[in-house]
A protein has these predicted regions:
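Short, acidic, Ser/Thr-enriched surface-loop or helix-capping motifs
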Residues: 3-4
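Flexible mid-to-C-terminal extensions adjoining Fe-S/redox cofactors in radical SAM and related proteins
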Residues: 14-125
Length: 125
């Protein structure tokens, strides 16, 4: 969770998209904006916890969420489309995915213990 200098409530300091502003909404209203609700509903973004980020490792999810929720770019210096932002991460994601999957598949894992966990077929690695 991040609030930028303009008051826009963003899901992450690196992801400059929002649909609510703390100067116009309460904190709870900001957290209930469609973008944050979509974040909650789509977690985990990947069953491989070495690939958790919706921007770096799962950019197709961030692109879909931003489009579906109508979130707008809040970058005060250089606004950009979500496609442009995510395109910068593809090379990294493509190189990291096989390594992360290998490491993840070779290690043991605890069962998910948090209450809102919903297994999703599309997120399987």
């Amino acid at each position: 969770f991040h609030i930028n200098a303009n008051g826009d409530a963003e899901p992450c300091v690196f992801i400059h998209y929002s649909g609510a502003n703390i100067r116009e909404n309460t904190l709870l209203e900001c957290l209930k904006q469609p973008l944050f609700m979509a974040y909650r509903d789509n977690q985990p973004f990947n069953n491989n916890q070495l690939r958790p980020c919706p921007m770096l490792e799962n950019s197709e999810i961030l692109q879909r969420i931003v489009k579906e929720t109508g979130a707008k770019s809040t970058d005060l210096q250089s606004p950009e489309t979500v496609e442009h932002l995510c395109a910068k991460c593809h090379e990294y994601a493509d190189k990291w995915a096989p390594e992360a999957d290998k490491l993840w598949n070779e290690s043991t894992h605890m069962e998910h213990a948090y209450e809102n966990y919903k297994p999703k077929e599309q997120n399987k690695c």
